[in-house]
Amino acid sequence: MVIKPKSYKQLAYEEIKENIIKGIYKPNQILNERSISEDFGFSRTPIREAFQRLYYEGWLVTRDNKKNVVREFNLEYILMNQKVRTSLEILAVSESICKFKESNIRDLEKITNEQEQIIKEGNFYNYIKLDRKFHEYIYLISENSVLTKILSNLNDTVRYFGQIALSYPNRQELTVQEHRRIIDAIKKRDEEKAIETMRIHMVNTTDAIEYSYK
């Protein structure tokens, strides 16, 4: 099977969105088409097409007659997003708990151990990737393709808002502790406990986001 190289439009889209998610492009920052095309070494056409897609997905807005403004998500929107995500995360752990094999549990433990090591190294972005990997592994084990697809569509906003939550003091360390409690409940095949520990984990994440917005 021949893998086609990504188009300039796709590369521009991915890079610009990643810069927004990582906070390189700040909320309310105006993105200059010419400047970005020069930075990327692309013509302005793929940059313009990438902007159009980012508008459609809600990452860019027009504000005060100024185009290509990085969207600033208000707290109300973030809390609605978290409410939906919490319900889905609980469903995922509920549907997966009886399907976990010992090897799967070891995989979750390995991810959590890697998170602890990353905290010591101070690699914030790799920590976030591992955090997503932990939750995505649970979705995978659930074998619920609809649930996995919905959560996959939320992935970028989850990463973006997760960075806000993890800026809360000691939140990274606390997240690892909460992940270990979830794993412990899965080991015991205690569905009620797994649901409750996941719910608490998500509530604490939401609280950290609210705190960071104050």
Regions found by a protein language model. Give the residues of each.
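Short linear motifs at protein or domain termini
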Residues: 1-98, 140, 210-214
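Residue-level signal for the nucleotide or nucleotide-sugar donor/cofactor binding architecture
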Residues: 42, 188-189
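Short alpha-helical transmembrane interface motifs in multi-pass membrane proteins
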Residues: 74-75, 161-165
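Short helix-capping and inter-helix turn/linker motifs at the boundaries of alpha-helical repeat units
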Residues: 7, 105-106, 170-173
